[in-house]
Structure formats: structure tokens, C-alpha cells
């Protein structure tokens, strides 16, 4: 009964989105995007698109999304939104982070990205424009990928905090007790592989077009950079996502080292009561702020 009820809710939500979409004017960017996509297909092989194209998307999106947080450190009026104002970013920390990122991106992630082509070939994932899913489907698929990745991340992340293995792997990610956006993928190579597997599980379940892979990469990077940003900015559109964790939730994990293990959502932490210390801390913070 619960499964049927959930299915009915999702079906109704999708029909509502379709209904709203029918009244929206045609996207003026659709034709230029279609032209650019077809131009890419005509001038590059599938291997080039799946490997070098995916690498370019990842690097461009990653550092583009890191840019606002990097600029915030130079803007005095943004410091009121910094969650740990007593721990500013330093050039030394950022340079250390950047060097680790370059190693992880090109020595760990690039070989994995090279496997994207063989993944799309094995599962017959299309690249063409005509079979590209419409935006309601794309959003739903990205959400499904996020649910799977968050579940994997919660349990494996929590396991990496076990006292017998923490200092060997996950401790690297906790080098910075006050996170900043660029630190999102700063991790031990083994952690990159272990937690990164959750990204690919969702892709294997939901991917039915090359564009979904790039859309999911974009959303995942946006989310992880946001929660590591160190800034709790009001009117953040990501907070419209139900059960979204956000920067303050994850910042506490870096400050406290335990609890708040979810990557995107808060439901697993609520279910297993691993957010209890955060809830007490946040209640105290709100009380102090109101006084």
C-alpha cells in the first residue's frame, strides 16, 4: 500500500510538472543548445565525448562553482554568513587543497572517466538529440541518483569514521575543520574510490542518455561544493529541495568530526539519530542569535 501510495504521489507530481510545462513559453536556448549538441556529435567521436567531454564538464563545473566561495573571502559583507568566522581560509590551506585536487582529478578520476565510453557502449546509452529526456524526466532522474548516492554515502562515510580505519583514510578529508568550497573533493585516493562508487551506482540505475550523466555530475558538484562552502547564505535555492542538508549541517560534521554523515539529505541522520549533537548545537546557536 505504501509503495502504491508513493507511486501515485510521484505520478501526480510528474503530471503536475507536465501540466505547468505545457503553459510555459518555448525555451529560447533550446535551438542553440540543439545546434551545439548536434555539432558536437558530428565533429567528435563517442569516445571523445564520453571521456574528454566528461572531463571538461567536470573540471569546468567544479572550479566555476568554487569561484563564488573563493571570492567571498575577500568581501567583508559576506563574512556575516560564514559559519565559522574565527577560521578564515588561508593561501597555504587553499594551495595544499589545490595540489591534492589536481592529483585526484587527473590520477584517480580521469582513469574512471575513461571508462564512461565503455559504460555507455555496454548499456547502449544513446547520445542523439531525439532521444534526449525532457527536463521533468531529467530532474526526476537526478533526484533518484541523489537518493541512491546519499544512501551509499551515509553508510560508507559512517564506516570510514570507525576508529580503527579513520586515521588511515578519511582523516585526510578532515584536515580542514572549517571547510571551503574547493575542499569538496579533497580526500584520500581510496576515499575518492569508495565514496565515489555511490555516484556510479545511481548512474547505472537511471542513466538512459549521455546528457543525464552530465546533468548528474553538475548537480552533484553543485551540492557538494555548496555544503562544503562554509557559508550559510539566505535564499539559497538548494534549500527548496526536501530534506536538503546544506552548508551548516555539513559544516558541523567538519567542526565536530562525528554525526551528520549524509551527503545531500538529512533523513538517514534523523533515522539513526546521528544528528542529535548538531540539533543541540543549532538550537543553542539560534537562542544565542535571538538574544
Swiss-Prot record:
Motif Histidine box-1 per record, residues: 157-161
GO biological process, one term: sterol biosynthetic process
An annotated GO cellular component: endoplasmic reticulum membrane
EC number assigned by the record: 1.14.18.9
Family: Belongs to the sterol desaturase family.
Domain-related comment: The histidine box domains may contain the active site and/or be involved in metal ion binding.
Protein name: Methylsterol monooxygenase 1
Lineage of origin: Eukaryota, Metazoa, Chordata, Craniata, Vertebrata
Amino acid at each position: 500500500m505504501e509503495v502504491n501510495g508513493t507511486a501515485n504521489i510521484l505520478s501526480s507530481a510528474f503530471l503536475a510538472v507536465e501540466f505547468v510545462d505545457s503553459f510555459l513559453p518555448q525555451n529560447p536556448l533550446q535551438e542553440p543548445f540543439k545546434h551545439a549538441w548536434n555539432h558536437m556529435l558530428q565533429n567528435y567521436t563517442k569516445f571523445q565525448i564520453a571521456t574528454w567531454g566528461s572531463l571538461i564538464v567536470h573540471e569546468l563545473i567544479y572550479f566555476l562553482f568554487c569561484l563564488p566561495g573563493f571570492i567571498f573571502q575577500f568581501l567583508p559583507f559576506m563574512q556575516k554568513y560564514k559559519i565559522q568566522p574565527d577560521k578564515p581560509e588561508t593561501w597555504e590551506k587553499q594551495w595544499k587543497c589545490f595540489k591534492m585536487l589536481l592529483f585526484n582529478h587527473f590520477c584517480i578520476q580521469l582513469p574512471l572517466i575513461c571508462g564512461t565510453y565503455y559504460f555507455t557502449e555496454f548499456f547502449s546509452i544513446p547520445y542523439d538529440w531525439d532521444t534526449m529526456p525532457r527536463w521533468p524526466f531529467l530532474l526526476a532522474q537526478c533526484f533518484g541518483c541523489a537518493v541512491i548516492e546519499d544512501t551509499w554515502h551515509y553508510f560508507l562515510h559512517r564506516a570510514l569514521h570507525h576508529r580503527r580505519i579513520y586515521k588511515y583514510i578519511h582523516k585526510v578529508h578532515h584536515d580542514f575543520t572549517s571547510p571551503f568550497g574547493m575542499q569538496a573533493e579533497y580526500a584520500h585516493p581510496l576515499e575518492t574510490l569508495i565514496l565515489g562508487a555511490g555516484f556510479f551506482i545511481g548512474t547505472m540505475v537511471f542513466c538512459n542518455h549521455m546528457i543525464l550523466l552530465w546533468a548528474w555530475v553538475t548537480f552533484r558538484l553543485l551540492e557538494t561544493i555548496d555544503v562544503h562552502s562554509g557559508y550559510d547564505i539566505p535564499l539559497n535555492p538548494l534549500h527548496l529541495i526536501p530534506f536538503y542538508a546544506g552548508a551548516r549541517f555539513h559544516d558541523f560534521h567538519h567542526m565536530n568530526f562525528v554525526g551528520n554523515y549524509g551527503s545531500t539529505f538529512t533523513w538517514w541522520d534523523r533515522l539513526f539519530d546521528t544528528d542529535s549533537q548538531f540539533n543541540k548545537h543549532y538550537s543553542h546557536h539560534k537562542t544565542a542569535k535571538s538574544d
